[in-house]
């Protein structure tokens, strides 16, 4: 069976349930069942490097590449329910990530543009990525706002919710810079936060020669450990809220 995360009846959440009984039926009712979409317990490798041996942490990342990352991270239940090659985008048919884009769109995670395009090869922006991350969880209000994200900004709710959860951060000048292209390192940092994945720094230090690592990544880089967390599949346990790696997969 599926792991059900929510049952929505007539637009109202009923919480996780194995079954739901309609009572006093006098008109048509709507029923929506949501399944867990992300692999939160299985720490697979979801980021890959390049043939030159680098991971290019400061490079931009395309909308297709982000689609591929989250496709790898889909739970088995979500794959079973949402996998498809059907889409309505005008520019995805020949994309290498057509299945990934179609599936995540079917799951309600990805959205295209008003002109009918998806723009798979375009660099994804900070606002767009925050919106994608936010769709994996319920939106929450909060006091974390940014000077360049007004309340009428299309991604205001997603950005402020993600900031409240600690998934995204702004800059020291109080801005979020929503239209800036997000970097690969920033994507990994946010994705790990969404998945509640934290790197075992001691394990990395003691076993570096066994790990997938990169020639453009030094231990002084701010996302060094996050990138190792995302690049190396591993078994782990949690001790005192800290992730302890047991072995590599």
Where are these regions (language model features)?
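Solvent-exposed segments in extracellular or luminal domains encompassing
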Residues: 20-28
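Surface-exposed interfaces of beta-sheet-rich extracellular modules
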Residues: 1-21
């Amino acid at each position: 069976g599926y792991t059900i995360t929510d049952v929505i009846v007539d637009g109202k959440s009923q919480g996780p349930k194995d079954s739901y009984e309609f009572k006093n039926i006098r008109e048509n009712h709507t029923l929506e069942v949501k399944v867990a979409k992300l692999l939160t317990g299985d720490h697979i490798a979801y980021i890959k490097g390049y043939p030159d041996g680098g991971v290019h942490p400061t490079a931009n990342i395309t909308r297709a590449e982000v689609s591929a990352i989250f496709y790898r991270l889909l739970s088995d239940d979500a794959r079973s329910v949402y996998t498809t090659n059907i889409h309505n985008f005008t520019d995805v048919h020949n994309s290498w990530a057509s299945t990934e884009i179609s599936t995540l769109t079917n799951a309600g995670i990805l959205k295209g543009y008003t002109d009918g395009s998806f723009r798979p090869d375009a660099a994804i922006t900070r606002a767009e990525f925050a919106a994608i991350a936010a769709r994996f969880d319920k939106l929450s209000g909060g006091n974390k706002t940014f000077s360049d994200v007004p309340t009428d900004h299309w991604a205001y709710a997603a950005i402020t919710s993600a900031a409240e959860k600690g998934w995204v951060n702004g800059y020291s000048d109080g801005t979020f810079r929503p239209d800036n292209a997000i970097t690969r390192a920033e994507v990994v940092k946010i994705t790990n936060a969404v998945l509640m994945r934290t790197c075992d720094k001691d394990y990395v230090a003691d076993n570096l020669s066994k790990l997938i690592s990169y020639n453009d990544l030094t231990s002084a880089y701010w996302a060094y450990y996050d990138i190792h967390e995302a690049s190396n599949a591993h078994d782990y346990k949690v001790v005192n809220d800290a992730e302890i790696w047991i072995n590599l997969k």
